[in-house]
Amino acid sequence: MVSAVEPKTYFLPRQDLAKLLDRLHDGGRQVIGPTIRDGAVMLDPIERVDQLPVGWGIDNAPGKARLVEQHGSRVFDQPPGPSSWKRWTYPPRLTEFAWTDAAETDAAPAPRRPKPVPAKMAPQAFLGVRACEIAALRVQDKVLLEGPVVDRDYAARRRDNLIVAVECAVAGGTCFCTSMGTGPEVRGDFDLALSELDDGFVVRVGTDAGRAALEGLTLPAATSDQTAAAAASVARVRAQMGEPLPMDGLPDRLMAAAESPRWAKIAERCLACTNCTLVCPTCFCTSISQRSDLDGDGASAERTWDSCFTLDFARVAGGNFRTRVEDRYRQWLTHKFGTWWPQFGSSGCVGCGRCIAWCPVGIDVREELLAVAPPVAPAADPPPIAPVAPMPSIVPSALTLPTPTAEGPRPMPWRTVEVLDRRRETRDVITLSLGTDDPGLLAGRPGQFVMAALPAVAAPPISVSRFHPDGLELTIRAAGPATAAIVNLERGDTVALRGPLGRGWPVELAEGRDVMVITGGIGLAPLRPLLDHMLARRDRIAHIHLAYGARTPGDRLYVDELDRLAASGVIDVAQTVDRAGPEWLGRVGVVTQVIDRIMCSCDRTIAFVCGPERMMRATVDVLHERGIPDERIWVTLERHMDCGVGLCGHCQLGRYFVCKDGPVFSLAELGPAFAVEGL
């Protein structure tokens, strides 16, 4: 993308379209455009004009998209097909990083660490980009270029795009871009824009790159009749789509309907087949899979498109947050039309209608939005109806793409650290002491986490359980193949870390207050750095109460450490177990029963809570009974994470990505989302 130039309008005779195609190929550029493949209009590399869908249309409706031969000479008389430009800017499959040997020294063998794999592709021209699809590119730019990190592969691919837009001449039965304010008019962010007439194309120039693509074609200026005919064609398309959906207040209406019975009704039809997310031009969720050579010498991580409709999308070691189809459909619809707004400043839907046409059971999001979140009747008589005018765009404006050498937010590099010590905490929990002098790793805050990677296994998120001047500790339960591999590391082994990531505990809010630290099982690990921080500043904290629950006495973490703290009297330590034998002389019961015995001034108490979410919800109920408000109750959440920086989409909870906006939140921030099952 480059700066726009003064608009100029030309006319391209139909027989000269081949010449324009040749110009688009100049400089080794690959041209991507619509063509007929597998019984549909797909986006593929185009070498010749006869590969374009000349004389073909599409008859589409909910659950239906059929090619229709029109026996004419028009090229772009179809609504969008199932493939989108996302396939070329954000490929369905690519190698994210490969394991390489670090610099070897005489003193030690070279440790292995992940290294990003740069994008390799020719510059591209996109021919036939609709207005809604330009909006989709803007939306993806916002997600992948303006987040906490820049997706370097996406940035490289977008930087070399030449956009040849096409204004729609027909509206499909599933199109609703007028409702989303994204079309059918092509308003900007193009290099060239074509409006197809029977004998040729009205051509608008949007950038210097677009003007350069027309050099040598000696095109005449478009006549007033030609420009009027082009405008009338787009106006007919707008009229064909009918009355726009009532979008005012939709995000709030959707979130207020989180427990509507309509979700279960939709789930009776929804197959959770993922078609809607795969054809969507803005969905960005991905998963990382590990690949390993048979000889063990090579390993890499492959990023693939994923979908919030898959069963394992929200699975973590302790269970699955969205087992029901209704929860997965709710996640998709509320994200697209609701929580995308606070996350990225726009809707996640551009109204292309692909999800409706390519749903095998014909679920129509337009109908479901009206059923789940009907518009609120106005309190007074509405004002007189004004003349129809184009709806304002609800997508972000064009973005300046980073140059290859631009400094800016990017994923943290992987750092190789050495295992200095290995300590068993319980039968299935190990604490690893890791040595490093990397200032980034050592600068973490209590409550942050790292991504830990070994060749050929997934890189799980792991909370830091202690920071040292010369390293850090990770306390890990062997809950799956990845954590089992990390737990089995021995002294002298190495592991790659990226981080620390996320938002930690608000330690500054504890000063001058009574503090309750309430946790269960391995949930003590992310709270341990918080305890370290408060103990180092003990004179600034009023009272510190630790309530710790475990399944059995043998499942407690840091036993000797907690016993020393309890004996010192520096903090009040209360431990309880769910069940125990006669050798256990302590409390038996759930941790919420311990909270009732804590003596504190609740009008100045702050609570930090970590554990299974059902345990945390029960704890919150008890804290509320004691008068502690949501603003002073802080929790840390567990969610599936493949990236740690808000790009994979797995960890979404309402308006938040747990990895980058959390994992620590106050109850006031989470609001009702904390209590809704399956969200």
Annotated model-derived regions:
Residues 2-255, 263, 535, 543-556, ...:
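Iron-sulfur-associated redox domains of electron-transfer enzymes in respiratory
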Residues 130-135, 268-287, 303-316, 345-362, ...:
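Local cysteine-cluster metal-coordination motifs and their immediate loop/turn environment
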Residues 154-169, 551, 629-650:
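Short, flexible loop segments at boundaries between secondary-structure elements
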Residues 225-250, 278, 294-325, 575, ...:
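A broadly conserved sequence feature marking short terminus-proximal activation segments
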Residues 247-268, 286-382, 623-626, 667, ...:
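Ferredoxin-type iron-sulfur electron-transfer modules in oxidoreductases and energy-metabolism complexes
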Residues 378-399:
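Intrinsically disordered, low-complexity proline-rich tandem-repeat tracts
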Residues 404-496, 550-552, 579:
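Ferredoxin-reductase
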Residues 481-642:
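FNR/FR-type flavoprotein reductase catalytic core
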